[in-house]
């Protein structure tokens, strides 16, 4: 591992093959087009044709008849005083020269490359003859590797100040790219750096498209599009290291976050749906097959986990929905499990927590799924109004549809995570129904909080302690395992499990 001056570790930039898992880095640029100018001022289009396995070029002026509408855009960002190369969004192939768009904010992208070297030393040919392997393979690889190395860095959050190893190691930083510190425990992101201008993968969607096979190592943030290393993301409570956005958590991770270790007792684990209305998928995947797919994918039997546990020593009944199981949709099994949980909490006088993450009622079960809204609400009425017990509703992103319209908004205390999406219908549906435009943030937690829909916006790392304090205010205290009260509590659970 190299060090730079000042004792800071350099970031990983040069080992392109290690990052992308390819032997020939030109395969990454099969759809990129470059505008090249030589010493004589002549301009060319250059691109890699993956089908012909060759690096092709075509004179700039040959595009006038076919792409005259795009020439002003191209000329506008070509430098007049020096040799420059610029990346053009929406790449070409030899059979497809339909569109050229300028990438925002990448003027002088290759400030430290002089294309005289490419045109003179590499025998850059005009027409459609281009470079051919194997004679030019070394030159092409060298050029493309330099391009990638100057633009792609594996970097941690700026200012981490730690000297620990990163998870992907590199060797050096090229040109004027700035070095970043590296630290274990801080997830990595792909950044680009040019003369102090920082570009994220939001501006480089092609890189993500070409590396999907390696995304099992990374989780992309829905807000900033930064990449988070999955091995450390769980220890960070699935919060984006780049922008602090609260990413989706699995139900198992949420139970681990809220419930004390060794106190979790699940309920109704073996309850599964049997396709009650024989849903017609219209030639698509059958409902039973979809259920089986998500059961294998998530390890769950349904879109909710319910059970009994302790939160900082306080016994609670808790249900946690999982959006990764068919979008957390509420069918007859989900409704039945939540109803049974509420009834058990009513009988045992336990505080109730339900964590919502759902797109709404499950269409494959028709009116049976809609009926769950009334069934759960009825059980909650007995729990809250007749027994006077405490129900805390926690809304996470996304919570929508029938869940929002029923138990999601019926809590005695409603807590929402920062920037969570909470809605009944989607923005597009509302605009088409009302025939008017609504603000983009009108369904975010902060906007709705100021309208009075929620009681608290609590970040994930404070959630457990805040709920514990709320229960204490309602005269619910931790159990002493040596007390008679704890023995009575365990005796109540034994007949159930």
Swiss-Prot record:
The lineage of its organism: Eukaryota, Viridiplantae, Streptophyta, Embryophyta, Tracheophyta. One of its GO terms (biological process) is fatty acid biosynthetic process. The gene is accD. Residues 217-489 form the CoA carboxyltransferase N-terminal domain. Zn(2+) binds at residues 221, 224, 240, 243. It catalyses: N(6)-carboxybiotinyl-L-lysyl-[protein] + acetyl-CoA = N(6)-biotinyl-L-lysyl-[protein] + malonyl-CoA. Keywords: ATP-binding, Fatty acid biosynthesis, Fatty acid metabolism, Lipid biosynthesis, Lipid metabolism, Metal-binding, Nucleotide-binding, Plastid, Transferase, Zinc, Zinc-finger. It is found in: Plastid. Pfam families: Carboxyl_trans. One of its GO terms (cellular component) is acetyl-CoA carboxylase complex. This is Acetyl-coenzyme A carboxylase carboxyl transferase subunit beta.
């Amino acid at each position: 591992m190299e060090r730079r001056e000042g004792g800071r570790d350099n970031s990983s930039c040069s080992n392109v093959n290690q990052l992308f898992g390819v032997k020939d880095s030109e395969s990454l640029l099969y759809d990129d087009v470059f505008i090249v100018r030589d010493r004589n001022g002549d301009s060319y289009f250059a691109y890699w044709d993956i089908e012909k396995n060759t690096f092709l070029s075509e004179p700039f002026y040959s595009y006038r008849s076919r792409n005259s509408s795009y020439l002003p855009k191209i000329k506008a960002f070509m430098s007049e005083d020096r040799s420059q190369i610029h990346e053009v969004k929406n790449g070409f192939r030899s059979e497809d020269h339909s569109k050229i768009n300028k990438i925002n904010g990448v003027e002088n992208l290759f400030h430290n490359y002089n294309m005289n070297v490419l045109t003179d030393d590499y025998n850059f040919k005009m027409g459609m003859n281009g470079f051919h392997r194997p004679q030019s393979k070394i030159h092409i690889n060298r050029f493309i590797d330099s391009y990638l190395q100057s633009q792609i860095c594996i970097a941690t959050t700026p200012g981490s100040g730690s000297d620990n190893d990163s998870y992907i190691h590199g060797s050096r930083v090229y040109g004027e790219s700035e070095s970043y510190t590296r630290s274990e425990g801080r997830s990595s992101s792909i950044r680009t750096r040019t003369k102090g201008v920082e570009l994220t993968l939001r501006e480089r969607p092609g890189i993500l498209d070409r590396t999907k096979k390696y995304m099992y190592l990374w989780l992309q943030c829905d807000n900033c599009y930064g990449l988070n290393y999955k091995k450390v993301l769980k220890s960070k409570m699935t919060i984006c290291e780049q922008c602090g956005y609260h990413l989706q958590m699995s139900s198992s991770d949420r139970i681990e976050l809220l419930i004390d270790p060794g106190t979790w007792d699940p309920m109704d684990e073996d309850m599964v749906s049997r396709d009650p209305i024989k849903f017609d998928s219209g030639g698509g995947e059958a409902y039973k097959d979809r259920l089986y797919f998500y059961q294998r994918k998530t390890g769950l039997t349904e879109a909710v986990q319910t059970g009994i546990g302790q939160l900082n020593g306080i016994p609670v009944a808790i249900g946690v929905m999982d959006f990764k199981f068919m979008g957390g949709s509420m069918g007859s099994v989900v409704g039945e499990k939540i109803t049974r949980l509420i009834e058990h909490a009513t009988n045992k006088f336990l505080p109730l927590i339900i964590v919502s993450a759902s797109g709404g009622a499950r269409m494959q079960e028709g009116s049976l799924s809609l009926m769950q809204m009334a069934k759960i609400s009825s059980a909650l009425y007995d729990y809250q109004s007749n027994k006077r017990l405490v129900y805390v509703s926690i809304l996470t992103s996304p919570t929508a549809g029938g869940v929002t319209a029923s138990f999601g908004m019926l809590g005695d205390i409603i807590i929402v995570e920062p920037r969570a999406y909470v809605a009944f219908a989607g923005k597009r549906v509302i605009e088409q129904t009302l025939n008017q435009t609504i603000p983009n943030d009108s369904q975010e937690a902060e906007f709705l909080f100021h309208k009075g829909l929620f009681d608290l916006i609590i970040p994930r790392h404070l959630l457990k302690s805040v709920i514990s304090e709320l229960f204490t205010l309602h005269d619910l205290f931790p159990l002493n395992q040596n007390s008679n009260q704890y023995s009575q509590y365990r005796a109540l659970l034994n007949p159930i499990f």
